[in-house]
Structures are given as C-alpha cells and as structure tokens.
Amino acid sequence: MDWSVFDFLVAALLLVLLFGAIGLIFVRRWSWLYRLGLALSLVTGALLFWVAGAVGLIGGAAHDANMAYPAMLTLGLIGSVVVRFKASGLALLLGGLGIAQLAIGLIAVLAGLGQDSQRWPDDILATSFIFSLLWLSAGFCFWRDWKTR
C-alpha cells in the first residue's frame, strides 16, 4: 500500500489526539477503572478507525462495507455524550458496540462480503472478535466502576 502525504497527516493527527486524550484522562481524579475504560475505548476506537480506513476489515479499504465501522464509531461518540460519560451508560454503550462489532463481521461473512481476501472468512471473524473483545473489556471496566461506587 502506498501512503500519500495526506495519509501520514491523518495518522499523525490521530496519534496526537489519541495520546493527548489519554494524557488528559490520567491527570483527572477519576477512579482507575474509569480511566482504564476510557483509555481502552479511545485506543480501540482509534485503532478501528485506522485499520478500517487504511486496509479495511472487510475486503480492501475501498470496500463499501467498511463504512459500517465509522458509522459505529460515530454512534458510540454520540451515545457517550447522550449518557454524559457516566460509567453506567458507558458500560451499556460499549457492550452494545462489542455486540455491533461482532454483528457487522457475521453479517459480512454471511453475505459473502470480502471474499476476494486470501484468508476469508477467518480475517473478518478474527478481527471482529478481537475488536469486540476490546469494546467489551472497556465496557467491563465501566461496569465494575459503576458497581463499586
């Protein structure tokens, strides 16, 4: 894959925003579970955005089905604002994102999307499982924070 200057600028901006946000998280006086949940969800979201945009999770990066991931991230961001970043709401929201991540992968495989990949369907199922596990882990951190208060 050949990267353009724009690709490098987007990647640099993504990393600066990610590390800046994580830095801000750890100077706040939230519980360590809440901070861990935020950091894990930010890293997962940034990684999903990067992978889906750069190489694509379903087929290649140009495959239209990959647009489900930015849509999912947008809903996650809107949902975070709606629940006002409360641990209880974030736990449910990230649980939903974990389920949505798996659902997107399963629907893609059942619909036969991305068959041009040499490792189809294992690549879609494995990445869906890994990202789902990351979302659910972040949600678990928020759930534990909510239950221990």
Report each predicted region and the residues it spans:
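Loop-to-helix transition at the N-terminal end of transmembrane alpha-helices
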Residues: 1-19, 32-41
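Alpha-helical transmembrane segments in multipass membrane proteins, preferentially the mid-helix core
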Residues: 72-86, 108, 138
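Membrane-interface capping segments at transmembrane-helix boundaries
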Residues: 27-28, 139-149
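Loop-to-transmembrane alpha-helix initiation sites
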Residues: 115-133
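A generic, lipid-embedded transmembrane alpha helix
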Residues: 19-20, 39-55
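Structural signature of hydrophobic alpha-helical transmembrane segments
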Residues: 3-15, 60-72, 125-129
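Hydrophobic alpha-helical transmembrane segments in multi-pass integral membrane proteins
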Residues: 49-57, 104-118
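Cytoplasmic-side transmembrane-helix entry/capping segments in multi-pass membrane proteins
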Residues: 31-44, 63-69, 89-99
